[in-house]
Amino acid sequence: MEGARADFARPDLIRFCWAVIPSLWRPSFYLRELDRDRLICLPVMLPQTTILVTGAAGALGRVVFASLQREGYRVRGFDRLCCPWSDPMDWVTGALQSAQDCQRALQGVGIVIHLAAVPDDAPFESDLMPSNILGLHYLLEAAKESGVQRILMASTGQVVWEPLNHGPWPVRAHVASSPLSWYALTKVFAEEAGKVMARDFGMDVMMVRLGACPRSPEHAQQIGADPIARDVYFSPGDLAQFFKLAVSMPWQGFHCLNAASRPLDQERLSLGEAKDLLGYEPVDQWPDAVEAYWS
């Protein structure tokens, strides 16, 4: 058998992989070189892999959860609120601030999409600290104990507030942080925690610096009145596309990427890294499909 594999011509094997493997494994695979004459296909994610979406009842979480489920992925929601859909779902109702709830939610999970957070500036001790700091700690510890290999965590463009507002544009993800608020500082903490998980524990971690995602009609009005916010608008459709690619494409280690839709005027957040790593190509621009976030 080993000799037969060695005799399999490389071009034929590559064509075989592209033709056959996607129909067997969803959604992608690595081609890893074993020696000069052989390649082996390694699936990025088997159909049995469960993806946990935290904050799945929120505006962003609902979009990501529903999109992945429509694509045929096995998805589990984790939120303090009950499942917003009437159909039976794999759902854990619990608190991010509870280590036990995080452990329960992560049982059997292979990939985590962490969207749960207090999403705006708020009292630090009562709101931001329990959810965005302590809750993140509990989640990452539970992920480590459960053997999770890939984690995608929401950050924010607010961590680079100074260049985002004053240039030079487009702002790349490697620039030094200049957080707007205590909320943005919690996301700086999350980015550094992600580096620790990748460096010390071998996890594949992606920090996603989200553009403007309106959670209500009032929030959408604020974005519509701000030319910079309009340029970093992140539509529901592009949000779904981004996370589907981040789940399915082969990447390893730590990455920090900007994520937004097409700008109306000026590219404020560089999308080059996301295009290069994931093949992400935004389709929408402000205000395309904005109502889908809350309808």
Regions found by a protein language model. Name each.
Residues 112, 123-151:
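NAD(P)-cofactor binding segment of oxidoreductase domains
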Residues 212-217, 233-254:
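Alpha-helical substrate-binding/gating segment
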Residues 52-70:
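N-terminal Rossmann NAD(P)H-binding glycine-rich loop of SDR-like oxidoreductase domains
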Residues 50, 286-295:
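Amphipathic terminal alpha-helices
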Residues 221, 255-257, 262-281:
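Conserved C-terminal active-site "lid" loop/helix of NAD(P)H-dependent oxidoreductases
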